Amino acid sequence: MTYDELLDTANKKGLLVKEKNLSRNNGRIKGNRIAIRKDMTITEKACVLAEEIGHYETTVGDILDMSNPWNRKQERQARLNGYNRMIGLIGIVRAYESGCQNQHEIADYLSVTEEYLLECIECYRDKYGKMKSVDNYMIYFIPNLAVIKII
C-alpha cells in the first residue's frame, strides 16, 4: 500500500494522522491520533504508518515499557499486522512472479524499505519456521528468502 492509501485507510478507521517533528520515534499513536515523523521519505512514512495502524487494531493500553513481556508481544502483533498490510505472503509471491531477484528489487516492487522487508522476513521466519506454502508456491525463509512454484 502507498502512503496515500494508508492515509485513506486510517481516515476510514477514524484515525487522525499528522506529520510532526518527532525526536525519538518515527511514529506514535495515542487514542485515535497518529503522529508520523515528517522528515522521512514517503516509503518510510508508509512503513511506519502501517505499524501504527497495526497498533490501533491490536494494542491495548500503554506498551512503552518493553521490559514487560506482554508489551513486547503486543509490539510484535502490531508489527506483524503492518507487515501483512504492506507485504504479506502473497506480496512476496507477486514480487517473485514479477521477476524480482534480490531484496532491493523486492522492496522497491512492494514500496517498502529494505530494512522493513528484512524485518518482515525475520518476523515470518519466527512465525512460520523454515517455509510456508501459499497457493501453489513454497516460500522459504531459511537460509534465505526463496520462492518456488509448485507444479
Language-model features: where?
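Active-site hotspot residues in diverse enzymes, especially metal/ion-binding acidic/histidine motifs
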Residues: 1-151
